[in-house]
Amino acid sequence: LKCHNKLVPFLSKTCPDGKNLCYKMSMEVTPMIPIKRGCTDTCPKSSLLVKVVCCKTDKCN
């Protein structure tokens, strides 16, 4: 699995074994502007201020 790992979308990395999800975190007030991206094993929960989106395909975040 390859996930974007920087704020600029064309940079990505191969996820280590066991991390089979990509995630993107953004502020609820500006959901189109990511604040953090990367690989994870479980999807973090969204909060009142931060929206988290997880996916399972290459560069989907």
Swiss-Prot record:
Disulfide bridges in this chain: C3-C22, C15-C39, C43-C54, C55-C60
CDD domains listed in its UniProt record: TFP_snake_toxin
Tissue expression per record: Expressed by the venom gland.
Membrane-spanning parts: none
Gene Ontology terms for molecular function: toxin activity
Primary site of residence: secreted
GO cellular component terms listed in the entry, alphabetical order: extracellular region
BP terms from Gene Ontology: killing of cells of another organism; regulation of blood pressure
Subcellular location: Secreted
Keywords, alphabetical: Cardiotoxin, Cytolysis, Disulfide bond, Hemolysis, Hypotensive agent, Secreted, Toxin
Alphabetized Pfam families for the sequence: Toxin_cobra-type
Top-level lineage group: Eukaryota
Family named by the database record: Belongs to the three-finger toxin family. Short-chain subfamily. Type IB cytotoxin sub-subfamily.
UniProt function note: This protein lyses red blood cells and has cardiotoxic and hypotensive activities.
Misc. remarks from the entry: Is classified as a P-type cytotoxin, since a proline residue stands at position 31 (Pro-31 in standard classification).
Name of this protein: Cytotoxin 3
Species per Swiss-Prot/TrEMBL record: Hemachatus haemachatus (Rinkhals)
